């Protein structure tokens, strides 16, 4: 875990050095099987605490598809597939996002990109930060 933490810190320092960040959302990791991810979650939050970020929030994983599932029960693999489909549809429908389509389509971890995108979109919309419809 120390190696992961050091690498993460280096990547954050390089990627974010010229960006002012005043808000960070981190998907809350739950359950005993997610112990490693829970540790990384803590490292991410600690990094931004040390950088003086004003708002750091943990948000539930279930949020990202709430606006699309309408309380329908789904299995893990169904949610992964749906998040990819929903993200692709949004990218195709929003002209200002078209340039992201090739990156998304070619990426080997589409499910992770989709989850992050939808989680961010949910947060922006439900915190009235901009009109994200």
Which residues does each predicted region cover?
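Phosphate- and other anionic-substrate recognition elements at nucleic-acid/protein interfaces
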Residues: 1-133
């Amino acid at each position: 875990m120390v190696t992961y933490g050091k690498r993460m810190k280096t990547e954050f320092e390089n990627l974010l050095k010229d960006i002012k960040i005043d808000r960070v959302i981190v998907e809350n990791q739950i359950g005993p099987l997610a112990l490693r991810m829970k540790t990384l979650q803590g490292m991410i939050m600690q990094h931004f605490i040390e950088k003086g970020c004003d708002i750091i929030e943990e948000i539930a994983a279930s949020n990202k598809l709430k606006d699309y599932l309408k309380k329908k029960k789904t299995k893990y693999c169904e949610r992964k597939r749906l998040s990819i489909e929903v993200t692709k549809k949004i990218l195709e429908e929003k002209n200002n996002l078209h340039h992201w389509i090739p990156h998304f389509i070619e990426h080997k971890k589409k499910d992770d990109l989709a989850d992050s995108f939808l989680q961010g979109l949910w947060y922006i919309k439900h915190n009235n930060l901009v009109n994200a419809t």
